[in-house]
Amino acid sequence: MLLAIDVRNTHTVVGLLSGSKEHAKVVQQWRIRTESEVTADELALIIDGLIGDDSERLAGAAALSTVPSVLHEVRIMLDQYWPSVPHVLIEPGVRTGIPLLVDNPKEVGADRIVNCLAAFHKFGQAAIVVDFGSSICVDVVSAKGEFLGGAIAPGVQVSSDAAAARSAALRRVELARPRSVVGKNTVECMQAGVVFGFAGLVDGLVGRMRQDVEEFSGDLGNRVAVVATGHTAPLLLPELHTVDHYDRHLTLHGLRLVFERNREAQRGRLKTAR
């Protein structure tokens, strides 16, 4: 059993995966709030409570974090509470198996890397990955499995909350599809702006990427998998015209792939690269 921990700015996903390679599957997944000042002891208490008896069956652990302070605590937690369980933390220097063809590879978020890795392994072809998190990341992986870069936009919930916070006439609304793109009240107007506006944003970015990436021109452009993931993806999927696939567990499988690559490359206890 593999413990996978995906820490983002607002929420953390904890997953348990069984099997390996093409036989791997996510058997449990939980979503909890991310606390930037959480301690290793608190993390251990939460995660041990979630996984229960499966704690004794862990054969490995893999984690990423877009919050550096939390990644430090995850490392301490794994060392102290599961010292016999080999683990990999996704950070600069660790073997991911995906070349980063960008100006500064160290700046690329671990979540973006493992998503593209998972998409390439799942579809075996060039792909565009759309991750709907606190930010919307639209990233490109080539037919050779290379990370080519991407675009980052404000997330759906973050944008909606910011609009409400900075306007006296607007309030925080439930993220839901309105009756029509033409809202009949303030709530519906905000929902229409969020749902249809962000769907147009994503479709626009994907379309421009298909045009701008030389590899995607001509017949090859028809062999580009476009996959969505992330907590708010299901809200927008019905309105998206460019997305072909949805994978709720894409990031967890990316973590698994990095763990397996490092397990095969090293003997004994796995360590993160320094």
Curated annotation (Swiss-Prot):
It is an enzyme of class 2 (transferase). K(+) binds at D131. Signal peptide: none annotated. Belongs to the type III pantothenate kinase family. Its cofactor is NH4(+); K(+). GO terms for cellular component: cytoplasm. HAMAP family: Pantothen_kinase_3 (MF_01274). The keyword Transcription does not apply. Substrate binds at G109, A110, D111, R112, T186. One of its GO terms (biological process) is coenzyme A biosynthetic process. GO terms for molecular function: ATP binding; metal ion binding; pantothenate kinase activity. Its main location: cytoplasm. Keywords: ATP-binding, Coenzyme A biosynthesis, Cytoplasm, Kinase, Metal-binding, Nucleotide-binding, Potassium, Transferase. A monovalent cation. Ammonium or potassium. Pathway: Cofactor biosynthesis; coenzyme A biosynthesis; CoA from (R)-pantothenate: step 1/5. This is Type III pantothenate kinase. The gene is coaX. It catalyses: (R)-pantothenate + ATP = (R)-4'-phosphopantothenate + ADP + H(+). It comes from the Bacteria. Catalyzes the phosphorylation of pantothenate (Pan), the first step in CoA biosynthesis. Its EC number is 2.7.1.33. The active site is at D111 (proton acceptor).
